[in-house]
Amino acid sequence: MLAMTTLDTLYPPTAPLDTPEHNEFRATVRRFVEEEVTPFHTQWERDGQVPREIWKRAGELGLLCLTVPEEYGGAGVDFSYSAIVVEELSRAGATGPIFYLHSDIVAPYIVQYGTEAQKQRWLPGMVRGEIIGAIGMTEPGAGSDVAGMRTRAEREDGANSPQGPGYRINGQKIFISNGQLCDLLVLAAKTDATRGAKGVSLLLVDTHLPGFGRGRRLEKMGLHAQDTSELFFEDLRVGADALLGEEGRGFVQLMEQLPQERLLVAIAAVAAMESAVIWTRDHLLQRQAFGAPLSDKQTVRHRLAQAHADTRVARAFLDDCLRRHLAGTLDTATASIAKFWCTEMQFRVLDECVQLFGGYGYMREYPIARAWADARVQRVYGGTTEIMKEIVARELFGR
């Protein structure tokens, strides 16, 4: 298990996450992870998902939906506290409880675009961990190409239905995190198939309604404790009050929220890098070769020194992005740089650490092996590296 005191010495909390209030909150999160997550994570990996009870426990401790206003049960604090939850889970290699998807991706859609009735219905339960949220964007034939999605939400006037006006949903989503557990899905669907991206709308779907189906739990290279699933919609009917925001504004809403999503991925990436360097350093100090610790070999020392330097640089850039986000000035291009650069660096650092572990680095009983496998998808979800670079290129060239 990672010695957190050692990690805090080499990678201490930095501004804007280093106030006494932040340190006190970090201690609470760390205690929760050490006592109620880490001892059970291997079993959750075998099960393919995290039990609902851990969500409720996180809710009891006030670790979910921290930025949700107090009138809906949240703490009403800023995003910096959410960043601490992401860091502590990632540092521990606890990639199963994907709280940030629920708290910092799904909940903000409702806070920002939801009606008062929608907020009252969904947010208190999400804060308590009784309602688990997910987001449905990706389809078998539409990943980065949101405009190409085929899931339809056809408007019905309700003249012949006792349920009144609403939408009838048909289609399929894939690679949906929290797919097996979710009670609420922020669904992106076409309400006007003739308008491309301008025909996309967001709807709040209660997954207990008739017509909603969960496919198999997908077997992944990594993230074994995260439930990732296919979802199906067959004549699923929701009321008109399920529309989130305005019809045809879904693509714009998704784009407005993506900078925070990409920053979350970058936060997890850098925290994982920091732990990987510590794990590798400790291994090199203990592992003997040719009568001396591997840490005495200059080539080995220099390779880990480079990984440490890369990690320090990533942290400095990430902290700058976090400060910008808290000030409301983090632009889309900078968030895209943070996402692709930090995740590319994460995989490079972790790959180097696996190499320095030798054969042990390929054994899943070692956290470095699991972290390496978990890291690979970071360059894919939340926007691929290639799409991130295209966003940056458009800013550079104006097109």
Give residue spans per PLM region.
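Alpha-helical interface subdomain recognition
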Residues: 2-92, 96, 113-118, 125-130, ...
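Short glycine/proline-enriched turns and hinge-like loops at secondary-structure junctions
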Residues: 77-79, 145-147, 178-182, 196-199, ...
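Short Gly/Pro-enriched turn/cap motifs at secondary-structure boundaries
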Residues: 99, 126, 141-144, 175-178, ...
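Helix-loop "lid/cap" segments that line or gate small-molecule binding pockets
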Residues: 104-113
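A short, Trp-centered hydrophobic/proline-enriched beta-strand micro-motif
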Residues: 129-137
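Flexible, small-/acidic-enriched active-site or ligand-binding loops
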Residues: 148, 210-239
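A short core secondary-structure module
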Residues: 150, 166, 170-214
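Long, acidic (Asp/Glu-rich), low-complexity accessory segments flanking structured domains
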Residues: 231-253
